[in-house]
Amino acid sequence: KPWLKNRISRCFFGPIKRPPFNRDELLDGVDYYPGDYLGKLAREGINGLWITVEFRDLAETSFAKRDPMAQRRLEKLRKTVEKCGRYGIKVWLFAIEPASLPAGDPLLAAHPEWKGARGWKNDYAFCTSSESALRYLRESLADIFAQVPNLGGLINISHGERITNCLSALPAVSDAQVNCPRCSKRPKWEIHADAARA
């Protein structure tokens, strides 16, 4: 028995869902988890694998309908969870959420309170300083976990690699003011705590 409760790894064969390729493993027909590989992981004490997802690619909420490709993604995710489970391996969702929203996104038009600090490109941080924003995040996760039973859990980087909430528009050790009309009035820790609690 491993001394760690969860020994989680990224699949050696799985594609990376970021530039330059941005490949979504849940949309292609490739089996990234062959039985021999899963058996070897299980013998080595690995009991978790993570798959990169974006909430809006999978979830339906009271704010947004399900993406047209979501059912295909969810079906492959369910099959992967079931297959890995036969080897005692849980599938964990890896996310960088809440995801920033590009300028012109219909969600920003419908919910201007979600438009947070200006991002690095032509995007905006997802402002978590409103109850509707937090409800959107909670509904997204609840829907995904309801659609795919037996997931291991969620690994989320909410400050680091990309713009997420308004605090993430600043470097982690910055003393600068958060550039958002709502979040600039709040303690920085509170901004991050909201996203984590959702």
Where are each of the predicted segments found?
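Feature activates predominantly on carbohydrate-active enzymes
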Residues: 1-159, 164-183
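Extended, regular secondary-structure scaffolds
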Residues: 186-198
